[in-house]
């Protein structure tokens, strides 16, 4: 219902030329208000304000951590002074608006590939516990809580064998024994340290006998006569994992459905993805009791997110059956693709489901541990979150010192990961990207809302979040060559930040008096 109010200046004078205005609830975005201005000339103007009319809270800085190029210690606590009254400073200011709320955050994590799990299990038990804690413990580690698991093999696996013997359409030989060796033990290790681990399931290819090219690799398409077989196969995967005490939060229809890769791959058009989700996957999942599993399309590069989402959601009943859209970072920034997709399909969830640096060796790629990788990760996450992504999932969580093991990649080599394990020496090293992710995951909790912020310099990238407990995390990337000392301004208060050149800073803010 609209409320009639008056607009006045600070000293009580009415705004010239404007008579009573009306404030309406914005039905699409509950945290926004629509204001109607009625001018004396009879012209009606409207504006959307993305804030709630709530009293301003008093906040205080609780912690600041920083990582920077050339520093041996990452996420180092740094000194700070508390907020003071805003004295009207202009220019070098970072603004944060706690009452301007956007999407809810679901989590951060990485892919528990067979490669990652194999490298994990090759370490001693004590080292495995140490590594699991470093990744998944919210107090002593990064607090990761959203991981991706392959349905079968992919290019970062030990072999290309499916869960069934060849030419078994009845799935009588179905077995996940290969996953019981490495993948499932790593998932269970993660679960021990993570409060609630969300898992995304993703297929790279159906078994060869289900495809028109007779191979798991080099693209090919799912044969029409095996559409039900493939859906049954996916259901069996979920059922077998459930027997192990592992449940999935969501799944994508297909990894990179536009790419005919030299490794495991399968091609779908946007329309075909939508049709398969609606006509086959969703009915099979519902019948088997997996009706709450969330279906996601695309799971490929950002430059085509809008078109592919539009094609899939044009399929009748697809907007009801499909929960979200996943994307990768390999084709450039394209952050506006996410914004436009959100604007067209505001109820859909956008997830950064894969990103990594690599190959690990050779060519023009930087070596392990290079700071530029951390900056690239941080810039990607800020850009995606500021355009409505609600989660980020890194690619391999662990590789060996050669970037593997891997399949079908002899010409380009392995990849990088945020942890490099050396089984021979029973050790592992945390890479710069580990800390880049940690600047978000350790301080932005599941259920947080992205909140409004703005900055003054193209070399300063920022993203801000309000946690369910009311605390706030502000992440700032200074990717420039100059040290900067901007003011952080929020709720009528300011404080000075010291941002070294090429650094990532997380500012933690709490309500005054909160523990």
Regions found by a protein language model. Name each.
Residues 1-58:
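Bacterial Sec-dependent N-terminal signal peptides
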Residues 34, 55-57, 99-102, 136-141, ...:
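A general structural signal for short secondary-structure junctions and capping/turn motifs
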Residues 51, 251-253:
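Short, surface-exposed recognition loops or helix-turn segments adjacent to catalytic cores
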Residues 59-70, 88-92, 200-201, 232-239, ...:
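Substrate-binding and catalytic surfaces of secreted/luminal carbohydrate-active proteins
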Residues 75-248, 269, 279:
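N-terminal catalytic cores of secreted or lumenal carbohydrate-active enzymes
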Residues 112, 151, 255, 328-329, ...:
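Residues that line or immediately flank small-molecule/substrate-binding pockets and catalytic motifs
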Residues 113, 252, 505:
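Ser/Thr-centric signal marking residues that sit
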Residues 254-260:
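Short, conserved phosphate-binding/catalytic loop or strand-edge motifs used
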């Amino acid at each position: 219902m609209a409320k009639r109010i008056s607009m006045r200046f600070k000293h009580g004078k009415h705004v010239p030329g404007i008579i009573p205005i009306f404030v309406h609830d914005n039905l699409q975005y509950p945290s926004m208000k629509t204001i109607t201005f009625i001018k004396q000339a009879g012209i009606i103007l409207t504006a959307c304000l993305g804030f709630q009319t709530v009293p301003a809270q008093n906040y205080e800085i609780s912690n600041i951590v920083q990582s920077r190029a050339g520093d041996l210690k990452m996420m180092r606590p740094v000194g700070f002074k508390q907020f003071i009254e805003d004295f009207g400073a202009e220019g070098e200011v970072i603004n944060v608006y706690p009452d301007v709320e956007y999407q809810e955050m679901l989590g951060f994590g990485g892919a528990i590939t067979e490669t990652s799990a194999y490298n994990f299990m090759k370490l001693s038990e004590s080292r495995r516990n140490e590594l699991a804690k470093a990744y998944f413990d919210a107090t002593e580690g990064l607090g990761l809580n959203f991981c991706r698991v392959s349905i079968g093999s992919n290019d970062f696996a030990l072999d290309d064998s499916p869960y069934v013997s060849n030419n078994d359409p009845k799935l009588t030989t179905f077995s996940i024994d290969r996953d019981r060796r490495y993948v499932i033990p790593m998932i269970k290790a993660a679960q021990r340290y993570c409060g609630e681990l969300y898992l995304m399931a993703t297929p790279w290819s159906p078994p060869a006998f289900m495809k028109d090219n007779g191979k798991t690799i080099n693209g090919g398409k799912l044969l029409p006569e095996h559409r039900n077989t493939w859906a049954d196969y996916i259901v069996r995967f979920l059922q077998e994992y459930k027997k192990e005490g592992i449940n999935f939060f969501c799944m994508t229809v297909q990894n990179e459905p536009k790419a005919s890769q030299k490794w495991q791959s399968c091609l779908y058009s946007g329309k075909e993805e939508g049709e398969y989700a609606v006509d086959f996957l969703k009915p099979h999942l519902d019948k088997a009791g997996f009706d709450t599993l969330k279906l996601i399309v695309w799971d490929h590069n950002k430059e085509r997110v809008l078109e592919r989402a539009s094609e899939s959601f044009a399929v009748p009943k697809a907007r009801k059956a499909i929960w979200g859209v996943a994307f990768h970072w390999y084709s450039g920034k394209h952050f506006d693709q996410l914004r436009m997709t959100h604007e067209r399909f505001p109820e859909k969830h956008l997830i950064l489901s894969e990103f990594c640096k690599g190959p690990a060796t050779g060519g023009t790629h930087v070596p392990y541990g290079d700071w530029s990788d951390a900056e690239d990760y941080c810039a990607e996450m800020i850009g995606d979150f500021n355009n409505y992504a609600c989660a980020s999932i890194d690619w391999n969580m662990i590789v060996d010192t050669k970037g593997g093991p891997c399949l079908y990649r002899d010409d380009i080599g392995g990849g990088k990961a945020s942890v490099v394990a050396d089984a021979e020496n029973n050790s592992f090293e945390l890479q710069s990207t580990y800390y880049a992710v940690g600047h978000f995951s350790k301080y932005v909790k599941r259920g947080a809302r992205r909140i409004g912020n703005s900055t003054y310099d193209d070399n300063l990238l920022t993203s801000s979040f309000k946690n369910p407990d009311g605390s706030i995390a502000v992440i700032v990337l200074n990717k420039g060559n100059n040290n900067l000392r901007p003011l952080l301004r929020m709720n009528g208060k300011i404080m000075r930040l010291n941002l070294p050149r090429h650094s990532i800073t997380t500012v933690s803010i709490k309500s005054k008096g909160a523990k």
